Design a protein with these regions (language model features):
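Flexible "cap/lid" loop of the alpha/beta hydrolase fold
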Residues: 104-108, 115-147
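Catalytic active-site module of serine/aspartate enzymes centered on a nucleophile-bearing elbow/loop
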Residues: 237-266
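Conserved alpha/beta-hydrolase catalytic His-Asp/Glu region
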Residues: 129, 144-201
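Alpha/beta-hydrolase fold catalytic core
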Residues: 1-27, 48-51, 88-89, 195, ...
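Gly/Ala-rich beta-loop-alpha elbow adjacent to hydrolase catalytic centers
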Residues: 95, 99, 103
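Active-site loop/oxyanion-hole signature of alpha/beta-hydrolase fold enzymes
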Residues: 14, 43-48, 52-94, 259
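Serine-hydrolase catalytic-loop signature spanning alpha/beta hydrolases and amidase-signature enzymes
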Residues: 33-41
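Conserved serine/cysteine hydrolase catalytic core
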Residues: 177-233, 238-241
């Protein structure tokens, strides 16, 4: 087994049939503090469309390896090595938030690999740091006291009032051993390298193939004034809005998200 397959955990979903056009690869990249599990339900739907779906846990997330190194450049190299090791020569990519930034950098660095790109609720611009309260809450959890799941959620609720956001973070909680919970993500590294998350796409990065940006109607991650910058980096792009949802579009309205992405990928 290639070393990258041991380092990067992935969920692989194979279609039940081979379409006339042949099986196409689809890569799905989660957002900051997320993991592949967040995308399994949608992944199964894409597989039913004839895609070979690979949902990755990016470094320092989920069941993938922990490393002191954490940047978009490193994540792109991880994904590139994974694609090479798994014979994913031509792929489409769906990336949400941090995974969307990773997907943008991958597509502009290795455009020959990528057929179509879908970016969910993130733009190529710089984002100021805004995860302080989430990190503060996560750092307040003292696992040496062996808290229960309910106690962990109670601590987080003091810093993260949004129930959906807490449930999203709780998915990364697991039993490290009987009676001992832990987070799967590498909180220690995020504490010191959180500024990496906000970094912009390099100014000269361009991807000329079909690209779909999907933003949440209640989210402020992609604003109308960002359209010009998006078009500069992605000339063959369009920007769609899912009404009445926030940043986690795929979780808040999975049906519409699937319809929009499936139609674009055909």
């Amino acid at each position: 087994m290639p070393i990258i397959n041991q380092l990067l955990h992935s969920v692989k979903l194979i279609p039940d049939f081979v379409p006339h056009s042949g099986v196409r690869g689809l890569l799905i990249l989660h957002g900051f503090l997320g993991m592949s599990d967040n995308w399994k339900t949608l992944g199964k739907q894409y597989a039913q469309e004839g895609f070979e779906v690979h949902i990755l846990d990016l470094r320092n997330h989920g069941r993938s390896f922990h490393s002191e190194g954490f940047s978009y450049e490193l994540m792109v190299q991880d994904v590139y090595e994974y694609c090479k090791a798994n014979n994913l020569i031509k792929i489409s990519i769906i990336g949400h938030s941090m995974g969307g930034k990773t997907a943008m950098l991958l597509a502009t660095t290795y455009p020959e690999m990528v057929d179509k790109l879908i970016v969910a609720d993130i733009g190529p611009k710089f984002y100021p740091q805004h995860h302080q309260s989430i990190l503060e809450g996560l750092n307040t959890v003292d696992f040496s006291k062996k808290p229960s799941r309910n106690e962990v959620e109670e601590i987080l609720s003091q810093y993260i009032p949004d129930f959906g956001a807490r449930q999203f973070l709780m998915k990364s909680l697991y039993w490290q051993e009987p009676g001992q919970l832990a987070f799967r993500f590498n909180l220690q590294v995020f504490n010191t390298k959180i500024e990496e998350i906000g970094k912009p796409l390099p100014d000269n990065s361009v991807f000329n193939k079909p690209t779909l940006f999907i933003r949440g109607g209640n989210s402020n991650y992609i604003l109308d004034e960002d359209f010009e910058n998006i078009k500069k980096h992605f000339p063959d792009s369009r920007i769609e809005t899912v009404p009445n949802v926030g940043h986690w579009i795929h979780a808040e309205n999975p049906l519409l998200f699937y319809e929009m992405t499936s139609s674009f990928l055909k």
